[in-house]
């Protein structure tokens, strides 16, 4: 059965990079069949998998050619290790609602049977925080059963993670979605691991993996590749492989208990963090 996973996190936290490298590790090290559906108007959720090739977004095709032209063959691109990719895209700047675009895109993909039964994983890479109903769609309407939140030891990243949990709680009973854990994408902040471990435990989940910071991630990106494709023997590739393994084997799925603001701020003060 295909596992459908939504990846959330504060804008700029490294969510798309983490998601693409994890998907690449699943396909390369564990022979998993993976589909990535980018739900960000920037349309950068699949760039590394596709070797930097710009992908025509579903919303662009919808505007330019009409719904009848949207087929799996026309819109889905295949990249590294046969990972299938689609980007929702968004409206023209200053016009329309990008969240509405996410809803339209996922509905069209389902209508066209893009999420085939042979897939092991479908990833929805979702813009920033749960800022509106459209971006909450993967968890609101049960499109994804699992959520992983990318965070770091910076206050605003944890604040965003806590807000995402509030959105998840709102929809958990109607959609069945559950939190699988927090991925700490390290910013090399003092006591970062301890902070995220305590935060995760306090909301009833786990820090599923601590991803160390390594410049090879940037080197791979400059070469328009994931770390896995760039050098699958390096330490960072092994870290992404370990995160992939933990997600594959994960059995801890919870409805989180978000912290009240006073409790979150007290935890931040305890670790001496300011953003």
From Swiss-Prot:
Modified residues (ADP-ribosylarginine): 100
Record InterPro entries: NifH/chlL_CS, NifH/frxC, Nitrogenase_Fe_NifH, P-loop_NTPase
Record-linked CDD domains: NifH
Top-level taxon of the source organism: Bacteria
This enzyme's EC code(s): 1.18.6.1
A single GO BP: nitrogen fixation
Subunit description: Homodimer.
Protein name: Nitrogenase iron protein 3
Gene: nifH3
